[in-house]
C-alpha cells in the first residue's frame, strides 16, 4: 500500500492520504500552527522529542495539538497515551483545551500529575503526609516487575514542564521507557524556568531523555 501511494502520489498529497481526517478538518485543527510547530505535530518517527522554549512561545498549544494529532492522525488509542504534569491545574487545563479540539474523546485520555499517577499505580489514595517518596517507590516497583504490564503499557508518554523533573521523576520516566521499548516520549519545557529547583528539579533531566 505504501509503495503504491508513494509511486502514484507525491509530496503533500501523500501526507493527506495518510491522515485519518479530511484536508478541511486538518486545516481547521492545525492550519494556524507555525512551520516548526507543524514539524513537531507531524513527526511520527522520533522516539524522543524534546521541545525547549520560553514563555509565550506556544508550548502549551503545541502540546495540546500534538495530543490531538496522536489521536486523530496516527493510530494511537487513548488508552495507549499518558500525559504527566506537575500540577492538577495544568492537568485540568490540558484536558479542557483538548476537549475544545477533539470533543468528549478527551475524557478518555490519561492526563495526571506525576504523584497522582504513581498513587494510582500503587493502589493508594494520595495524602499530603505520604507524598514525598511515592514517585521513587513507583519507579522501583516498575523496575522490579511488581506492576502489571496492563497498568503501565503505553506507546506514547507526554511530559509537560519537563524542566521541573527531579531525579525521582526521571527515574519513573526511565522505568516506563525500559518496560515499553517502543514507547515515544514527547517532553516540553523551558530550561530558564524551574520553579521546583528547591526540591532537586533540574532541566538536565529533560535533555537526558533524548540521549
Regions inferred by a protein language model and the residue ranges of each:
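P-loop NTPase Walker
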Residues: 1-127
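Basic/charged alpha-beta structural segments of nucleotide/phosphate-handling enzymes
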Residues: 1-13, 146-152, 157-158, 189
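Catalytic P-loop NTPase motifs of RecA-like helicase/translocase cores
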Residues: 40, 58, 70, 118, ...
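Short basic/glycine-enriched coil/helix segment immediately N-terminal to the Walker B
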Residues: 43, 133, 140-157, 178-181
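Structural preference for long, well-ordered alpha-helical segments in enzyme cores
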Residues: 63-67, 90, 94-98, 138-145, ...
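Conserved two-lobed SF2 helicase motor
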Residues: 110-116, 130-142
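SF2 helicase catalytic motif II
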Residues: 152-169, 186-187, 192-193
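Conserved RecA-like helicase ATPase core segment
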Residues: 171-211
Amino acid at each position: 500500500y505504501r509503495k503504491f501511494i508513494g509511486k502514484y502520489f507525491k509530496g503533500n498529497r501523500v501526507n493527506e492520504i495518510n491522515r485519518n481526517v479530511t484536508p478541511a478538518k486538518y486545516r481547521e485543527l492545525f492550519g494556524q500552527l507555525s512551520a516548526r510547530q507543524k514539524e513537531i505535530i507531524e513527526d511520527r518517527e522520533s522516539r524522543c522529542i524534546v521541545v525547549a522554549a520560553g514563555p509565550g512561545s506556544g508550548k502549551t498549544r503545541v502540546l495540546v495539538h500534538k495530543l490531538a494529532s496522536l489521536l486523530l492522525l496516527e493510530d494511537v488509542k487513548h488508552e495507549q497515551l499518558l500525559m504527566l504534569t506537575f500540577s492538577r491545574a495544568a492537568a485540568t487545563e490540558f484536558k479542557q483545551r483538548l476537549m475544545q479540539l477533539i470533543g468528549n474523546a478527551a475524557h478518555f485520555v490519561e492526563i495526571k500529575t506525576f504523584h497522582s499517577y504513581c498513587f494510582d499505580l500503587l493502589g493508594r489514595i494520595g495524602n499530603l503526609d505520604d507524598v514525598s517518596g511515592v514517585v521513587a517507590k513507583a519507579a522501583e516497583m516498575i523496575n522490579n516487575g511488581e506492576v502489571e504490564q496492563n497498568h503501565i503499557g503505553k506507546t506514547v508518554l507526554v511530559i509537560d514542564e519537563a524542566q521541573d523533573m527531579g531525579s525521582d521523576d526521571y527515574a519513573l520516566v526511565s522505568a516506563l521507557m525500559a518496560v515499553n521499548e517502543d514507547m515515544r516520549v514527547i517532553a516540553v519545557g523551558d530550561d530558564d524556568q524551574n520553579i521546583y529547583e528547591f526540591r532537586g528539579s533540574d532541566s538536565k533531566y529533560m535533555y537526558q531523555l533524548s540521549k
